[in-house]
Regions:
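Terminal, non-globular segments
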Residues: 1-167
Length: 167
C-alpha cells in the first residue's frame, strides 16, 4: 500500500502544479497556444498509474479547473473525463509505444479535446476561436516527451527511495 500512497502524493502535487501553471498570465496571442497542463498530467497518470488517475479524479479535477478558470461549470470536467477514458481504453497499447509515438497519440487526444471544446462553445453560443486555437495540441505533443520523462523520473526516484527505506 505504501507505493500507492507515494504515487498518489505525486499525482496530487502534479495536478496542483498543472492547475497553477495554467493560471499563469501570458500574452493573448501566446495564451491560446498554451497546452492544457492538466490534460497532460492526467494522461500521464492514466497511462502509468491508472490506480490513482481514474474517471472520478478526472471529473473532480475538471470541476476544479472549471472553478479556477471561471468557465462553464462541467466543461473541463466533461473534457477531462473523455480524455482519461480514451487514455485508459487504449492504455495497454500506448504504454509500449516509444515516447515519440506516444506524443502522436497525445496529439490525437488533445485534438479530440479541442474538438469537444469547440462543440461546447458552439452549443453555448460563444464566439468562434481564432485559428491559433488549433496550435495547442501541437504544443502539447511537443511538450509531451519532457512531461513524460519528468514525471516518470520522479516516480522512479520515489520508488527507489521507498525500496531503500524498506531494506
Amino acid at each position: 500500500m505504501r507505493p500507492l500512497r507515494g504515487t498518489y502524493r505525486l499525482f496530487l502535487l502534479a495536478v496542483a502544479l498543472a492547475l497553477l501553471l495554467t493560471l499563469l498570465p501570458l500574452p493573448t496571442w501566446l495564451a491560446v497556444m498554451k497546452p492544457m497542463a492538466l490534460a497532460l498530467v492526467l494522461t500521464y497518470f492514466a497511462l502509468e498509474a491508472p490506480e490513482v488517475a481514474g474517471l472520478g479524479h478526472a471529473f473532480l479535477f475538471g470541476l476544479c479547473a472549471d472553478i479556477l478558470y471561471g468557465g462553464l461549470l462541467g466543461e473541463h470536467a466533461l473534457r477531462m473525463v473523455i480524455l482519461v477514458y480514451l487514455t485508459l481504453r487504449f492504455r495497454h497499447r500506448l504504454r509500449f509505444f516509444p515516447v515519440w509515438q506516444q506524443a502522436g497519440a497525445v496529439f490525437a487526444l488533445l485534438l479530440n479535446d479541442r474538438v469537444l471544446d469547440l462543440w461546447i462553445r458552439w452549443m453555448s453560443g460563444s464566439t468562434w476561436p481564432p485559428l491559433v486555437f488549433w496550435l495547442s495540441p501541437l504544443v502539447g505533443m511537443a511538450v509531451w516527451p519532457w512531461v513524460f520523462l519528468l514525471l516518470d523520473g520522479l516516480r522512479l526516484r520515489r520508488r527507489q527511495a521507498q525500496r531503500e527505506r524498506s531494506s
